[in-house]
Amino acid sequence: MAIAWIVLDLTGSEKTMGLINSVPGIAIISMSLFGGVLADRFERWRLLWQTKLAITFLSLLTGLLLTFEIINSSTIWYLIPISLIIGMLFALHNPASQAFVLDVVGKRNLVSASSFSAASSTIATIAAPSLGGILLWLGYDWSFYTLAIFYFSSTIMILSIKKRHKSVIVEKSNNVFYDVKSGLLYAFRNPLIRSLLIISITAIFSGIYQPVIPVKIKNDLGLGEFEYGIVLAMNGVGALIGSIFLFIINERIRKIYLLIISFLAFDLGVLIFGFSPNYAICIFAMILLGVGFASWMVTIPVLLQTNTSDEMRGRVISLYYMTILTYQLGWFFGGMLLESFGIHVSVLIATIGSLSIGATTILFSKSLRSAN
């Protein structure tokens, strides 16, 4: 949120905003498989707190660079190496984080745990953008100092976990690349996992839509940081509503229906937001987007984890993050589309691309349609 607004405000360039926000995705996509191997080989708890602490330091560093005006309109590129390193850290953190949840709660409670986790995290998604809008108004550096505090608090919470399970002990080959190859072959040969990963690639179209949000609020509607924060918070409200609903119905509805709901709600929200004539409709669209996102998060990650062997779980989750975090590459393409064609064309391309891949995969994958 903060970097997108800062870059757009300092440079006035949608393309530059998209480029800088796409950088973490490059690191995550290129390193996630190795993060998955580490999650399978070593204790996940240790990986989690160490990577989170490093991200805390980088957030603090970014805040200091903004405070002393070392980062400005002519040195905005300093954000590129920082974003690249943060992306590398998340590439190591994400597979371990997802796999660690299953270590603690087990497969039987994974759906409920995922719904509860999504509901808890979306409370922060509601509060953080609202607070972030105020912090951006007070000063760009405030946002990163606050992020550093939250990341450090998260580190302390991870360290305080008493009940933790070590990763399943598996035979370790001497060649990390062999482990990567075995993970790729395992995922490709499993029809359900393969279909879920193809579906996840639609995240790049979500990324194409992301630059539309600050441009719509700042340039189209002429609003400021606070309104930008509020509209992002409404995405969290929608996700919270969706998470609570999914927690209640739990396993009463087949996962394929939840997946269809996620596509329809999200892509309809994208269209409404892009063509909305006023701020109120933008808020409604963001709530709808949040509902779609919640349905996604309680469908695809859960199906992947519950249909993957224990010794391959970290690598499969890393593949999931490689595909879903193509949305950050979408930032770059979205920025280019915005500068060249505007908001309406951008959201149309994002919606058509997402629905086309999603519908085709569901139609031709029997294993996905029968998954539950």
Give the role of each language-model region.
Residues R41, L47, L61, K181, ...:
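C-terminal transmembrane bundle of multi-pass solute transporters/carriers
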Residues M1-A27, L185-A233:
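Helix-loop boundary and gating motifs at the non-cytosolic
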Residues L8, L61-I70, I86, I158, ...:
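MFS-fold secondary transporters
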Residues K163-L197:
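Juxtamembrane intracellular "pre-TM" segments in multi-pass secondary transporters
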Residues A4-L10, G63-I71, A127-T146, N219-D220, ...:
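Transmembrane alpha-helix termini and helix-breaking/packing motifs in multi-pass membrane transporters
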Residues M1, V23-V37, E43-T56, Y78-L136, ...:
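Substrate-agnostic recognition of the 12-TM MFS/MFS-like secondary transporter fold
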Residues L64-I82, G274-A285:
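Helix-loop junctions at membrane interfaces in 12-TM secondary transporters
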Residues I76-S83, G87, S112-S167, A233-V237, ...:
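Hydrophobic alpha-helical transmembrane segments
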